[in-house]
Amino acid sequence: MKIALDVMGGDNAPDINVDGAKRALQDFPLIEKIYLVGREETVRSSCDRWGLSGPRVEIVPAAEVVEMNESGLLAVRKKKNSSMSISVDLVKSGDADAVVSAGNTGAAVAAATVKLRLLDGVERAGIVTQLPNEFGVCNVTDTGANPDAKPRHLVGYAVMASILARSVYGKQMPKVGVMSNGSEDEKGTDFTKGTFCLLKHLEERGALPFKFVGNVEGHDLFEHEIDVALTDGFTGNVLLKTCEATAKAFSKWLKEELKANPFRMVGAACASGAFRAMKARLSADSVGGSPLLGVRGVTIIAHGSSTPVAIRNALRVSMEMVQQGVNPLIEEEMARLGTIPEVAEVYPK
């Protein structure tokens, strides 16, 4: 298995990527080779610093870098020799089985969608982000690929994310819900109601490869066994960033309160193990990155502030998706499902 890594992607590139690649190669013998894509001298210097060399790594020169503040689609069109574009090209040519990037999310989505194209039966690609909950993780989709979506697109997201939940996260019959402002069937906007109606219609036909649990609220993602939560890319991205900010704020406030009193500091020292465990549970490092489902090639988009551990785990997730054949399973299930109807075709007004 060969993976292309955009070494210039991320706030702390290239070192976090090179260090992460080294950790992945040490831990996962199934990875035959990692292509380190970026400015050659920069990548080579980083490899020297981290002691990364050998037949399982290959530096692929890329003269340009897509910056975090650039327009995604425009950057892909203008910077054809960027580390991100060339990383995706390696998947397109068949030289790599997957691509991992902690760079500009919009550019990563555009590059993968334009260059790799969509899988058969897929209308829109969607980003799936894992949020920790009492039962492992909740796969939230879409978290940023398509701000404007139609109900039938969310049905496609449901199929793809449920396959990910089953293949990579071990959920034999994933529980899928539509994010709404209440759990009652009639709650929500026309968009969420339409999604609910389509899924209910397909459930009654016995066409769903997962258990549809209806509408779910924000707290359900953390308190109940919801394996996949469906929403549009705008709402999903707001949810994701709110969760990230809340976790950071809670950590900051807790530290401030503990430091305000020496007796609290003594208690904190006694509970240091619990604090470390909680930090690990809330950290995105264990997840690694968010899969972009629906494109012809495994694509993982890591957070811009990823650590080496996160990059290592993003490479792991890409490896597991290739190993489990997630994309062929998506095409197979979408073919079985057939054309997804419009809401008006199922429930005419």
Curated annotation (Swiss-Prot):
* Top-rank taxon: Bacteria
Transmembrane segment boundaries: none
**Which EC class, in a word?**
transferase
Q: In which pathway does it act?
A: Lipid metabolism; phospholipid metabolism
User: Catalyzes what?
Assistant: a fatty acyl-[ACP] + phosphate = an acyl phosphate + holo-[ACP]
Q: Which InterPro entries match?
A: FA_synthesis, Phospholipid_synth_PlsX-like
Where's it found, cell-wise? Cytoplasm
Known EC number(s)? 2.3.1.274
Task: Report one GO cellular component.
Answer: cytoplasm
What role is this protein assigned? Catalyzes the reversible formation of acyl-phosphate (acyl-PO(4)) from acyl-[acyl-carrier-protein] (acyl-ACP). This enzyme utilizes acyl-ACP as fatty acyl donor, but not acyl-CoA.
- Principal subcellular localisation of the protein: cytoplasm
Gene (UniProt) = plsX
- Biological process, per Gene Ontology: fatty acid biosynthetic process; phospholipid biosynthetic process
| Hydrolase keyword on record | no
Family assignment from sequence similarity: Belongs to the PlsX family.
Q: What is this protein called?
A: Phosphate acyltransferase
User: Which Gene Ontology MF annotations are present?
Assistant: phosphate:acyl-[acyl carrier protein] acyltransferase activity
Q: Keywords on this record?
A: Cytoplasm, Lipid biosynthesis, Lipid metabolism, Phospholipid biosynthesis, Phospholipid metabolism, Transferase
